[in-house]
Amino acid sequence: MTVTYEVPLSYTINVSLSALPQGLAEFNTNSIAIFSNEPAGFSDSYRAYLTPSSVATDFGSNSLTYKMANALFKPVPNFRTGGGNLYIFPFDGTNATAGNFTTIDLKESNITAFQSLENGSLSITIDGKTSVVSGLNFTSVKTLEDIANVIRSKNLDVNISVDSNKIVFTSRSAGASSSVEINTISKADLIDISSSTYLDASNGIATAGTDAKGTTLADAVAQAIQQVYFGGVLTTQVVGDDTRLANATAIQPLDCVYYDSLQSLNAISKIGADIKSAGLGKTRTLAYSKDNHKVAIATYASVASSVNYSGSNTANTMNLKTLTGILGDSGLNDTYLLSAQSNGVDIYANTGGISVVYSNDNNGYTDDINNQLWLKKALEVAGFNYLRQTNTKIPQTEEGMTGLKNAYAQVCEQAIRNGVVGAGTWNGSIPFGDAEKFTEAIEQKGYYIYSIPIAQQPQTEREQRKAPVVQIALKFSGAIHFSDVIVTIQR
């Protein structure tokens, strides 16, 4: 057989196959990390969880870690709706303790004396703030628990419990500044229940609170976020106000949101005010005076992290949201309500038979802070992937800049779809770009993107292969929280 030479097809047509480089996946700002100072059933630095039952296996079903994790999965929607994962990081920070005042053993004679008292008074100093309550009617009491209930009815910012034959008054704050004292009332027209006939407070014992020790939450978060990304931070640790403020300050520069609870309602005007005045908007506080305040803030964080930013009209507000499984705070009053509003602390109250969150402005509302975090991470990924996903290069030309700005514009369009951004009117002076185009873009779309022409870029920046700075103006759609209605009627 004669073999005839054939010229290979590749001599004429040479085909090479290449794939575009893989880009970064989007950061999931709805993922939540619990930093647990309870014993863990594993030695890893952290574990990921898709169900609360696995948390019970590792920490025990009676642990606070499990109760907080379980609370994350309860609301509908919750952080999983937003695609979030749960990570739990063990760390060795100890709990701060609360100050308390414990009476001596009270006898039957003390209870008998209370039974004849219709208008008793009590002066108590809690964390340095003195309150005097009167009108304490003990005529129906039979036990120390009954006596405690009468005092509880005055809604003092203190936990009152019975331990054998003693009544214990425990501060709802913790740390070295946490304290409780029972005072003597000097007014002759008031019947002082601190006297030896009743509580015999002069022989009671006041114990000051102590600060947390060991690894701080701030240090634990800084180390953990290098291992896996999460957008929300919770902790089982109990801390004092100084440590809480230090944690908030350290977490503020990080790309995450710190959710914390305040059991003391008086803390609204103290640490709540400090956090707001320091500009620490990434710390979101919920004042809730019940013992399960840590579970309440976990439920709150889950609802706040439930936005699926890939969806349509999915953006939310925490205002008037119900926290599944959490009762409204019966310790609230008008003073605390107004204090929470002015100091940017959220509360959970009863209105018309339902329990809802009242969300307040701490350098932005909770949804503002979460939306800003998502927006930042989405823009980072969009810009990186545009530069990354080419087998050649993005030229330093107007064409290259148009492509880069288009990548950022896709995030802005997504923000319109999910309801974070909306068309509106820009209030104030035009900050950059062409004033007419700026105004038109904000009114028609809700965002405006601008960069100076390549020809105007400083040569030093061009030599460093930097793009001209891209400036983006966004009009957040906000949320309606209040409404005034005026009705004019003619007869």
What name fits each language-model region?
Residues 1-31, 38-41, 46-121, 126-132, ...:
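Polar low-complexity, Ser/Thr/Gly/Ala/Asp/Asn-rich disordered segments used for subunit assembly
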